[in-house]
Amino acid sequence: MKAANITSPVKLGLIGSLLLASGFAQADWSANLGYASEYHYRGIFQKNSSASGGVDYETGGFYAGTWAADVGDGLEVDGYFGYGADVGDVSLSVGYTGYFYTGDFDDTYQEINLGAGFGLLSLDVAVGEYENFSGPTQDYTYYALTLEKDGFYGKYAGFSQDFEGNYFELGYGTTVSEIDLGIVLLFSDSDLVGDSDENIIFTIGKAFDL
């Protein structure tokens, strides 16, 4: 993940949002394969033409998993775990995510993730630390407000503390013959990517029980 003029992490974002939008529900053990015409994470470009894959486990609200993507100079490998539950009409979650790299593309990110959802709206917050191996450690907070209905979603998100910048996504995800398809319009501001940027991204994926 590259953020605000700094090399930064996570990639559950784009493909994960599309899988949720298309109504994918996990079993106890599940796996996924995906491809994106461009890999952007949290509004920041990572790589053209990127393949990815992951394995997840969920039971009784607890979840854990790993996800990897091609970033050109090696792989990004994410690990995560947490717990989610419904309290009345509100869904709540708390978890941890670590972003690691096999090559020189980026350094390690680690963060605590908090989430809340009510009706069509969801709010996600991540409080993290960037272990910049060539410089001082940096702290960041990420926030995202998402509105989702019938496969369509809109998201406004951004960073604060040592990272800065904002972006906006409009997307649609659907499933055709058990294949997940998605399209995203992404608008990133100049604080996030050095110059304002607009992108159209296409994704395809397959999720299956193990």
Role assignments for model-derived ranges:
Residues 2-17, 22-210:
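Outer-membrane beta-barrel proteins
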